Structure formats: structure tokens, C-alpha cells
A protein has these predicted regions:
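Terminal low-complexity/charged segments
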Residues: 1-170
Length: 170
């Protein structure tokens, strides 16, 4: 573990319920969903992690508890360090609290979590789909999403897709 990161990890372990995994010089800190906003605020305000450089999820289907890990990658430019926070989330009704009050950049990334993985973000200011058209069923980055499906029609590709569709002939 990076020497600059050790006191930060130790402070998180003392104050929050965490577990740590290290793999190839990367440190992953596991945080409970109900603690993530407090941890993000602490890291931003006390330890200069001013940049939320990534926010995504990983699906561990068919495992259900936890099925997902929501992954926050934070960077401190002043300290030249990066840390990954992982929030395990169950598969039945996946929910996490919004981080938009801590990092504005979380807005669209959290909408992507809802759209692509079906992870509900509680308290989000604009919980609309961001990538898929309204009315799309399912969440394409889930491992149980069917691979053979009809391509969604957007305004720019309606004619192109229409030409490929088989229509009933009389």
C-alpha cells in the first residue's frame, strides 16, 4: 500500500465499518451503503480527494448477496493518490444514496447506474434514463440481460433499423 494512503485507510477503519483488499498496488476499501456519503465527504474535506474520477458498478450474477459492487474512484491531485471505494449492494432491490451533494460530477454517472444496471439512487435530483430510450425494458450491463434483442431506435437511426425489420406481407 502507498505510504501516503496508509493514514487515510487507518482513519477510515477506525471510524467506519470497512474491510480492505489490496491487489497489484491497488487498494479497495469496502464501505456500507449507508456510510458512503459520510465517507465521501470526509475524503473530500479532510484528505483533499477533490475528484470523483469514476463511478460505475460490477455485476456478480448469479450471486445475489451482494450481486453488485458500486465502485467510486477518487483522486487527490494535491497528494497524488487514488483510492477505490466499493459498496456491496444486494440484487433484489439494489439501492444506494446519491453522492451528488458531495460531488456534482456524480449526477450523470449515477443516472448511468440506474439506466445500465438498474441500481436505484435514492435522493437523486434527476432520476431519468440517460443512455437508453424511455420505455426500454431491462438494464443492458446486467449479466442476466438477454444477448439477442432488438436494437433500440433513436432519432438518428430509425430509418436504418426500419429497413432491416421483417414486416408481415399480405
Amino acid at each position: 500500500m502507498d505510504k501516503k494512503l496508509e493514514p487515510i485507510v487507518q482513519a477510515l477503519q477506525e471510524k467506519y465499518t470497512t474491510s480492505i483488499e489490496e491487489f497489484r498496488d491497488e487498494v479497495h476499501i469496502f464501505i456500507k451503503a449507508e456510510q458512503i456519503v459520510d465517507v465521501l465527504t470526509l475524503l473530500r474535506d479532510k484528505y483533499d480527494f477533490e475528484l470523483l474520477s469514476a463511478l460505475t458498478a460490477s455485476d456478480y450474477w448469479p450471486q445475489q448477496s451482494p450481486r453488485f459492487h458500486v465502485i467510486y474512484q477518487l483522486s487527490s491531485i494535491a497528494r497524488n493518490i487514488t483510492v477505490q471505494l466499493r459498496v456491496p449492494v444486494n440484487g433484489d432491490q439494489p439501492k444506494i444514496p446519491t453522492a451528488t451533494r458531495v460531488y456534482d460530477v456524480a449526477n450523470w454517472r449515477e443516472r448511468e447506474l440506474l439506466d445500465m444496471f438498474g441500481i436505484e439512487v435514492e435522493g437523486h435530483p434527476d432520476p431519468r434514463r440517460i443512455l437508453m430510450p424511455e420505455g426500454t425494458e431491462g438494464h443492458p450491463l446486467r449479466k442476466d440481460f438477454p444477448l439477442g434483442y432488438e436494437e433500440p431506435q433513436f432519432t438518428f437511426n430509425i430509418k436504418e433499423i426500419d429497413l432491416r425489420k421483417p414486416y408481415a406481407k399480405e
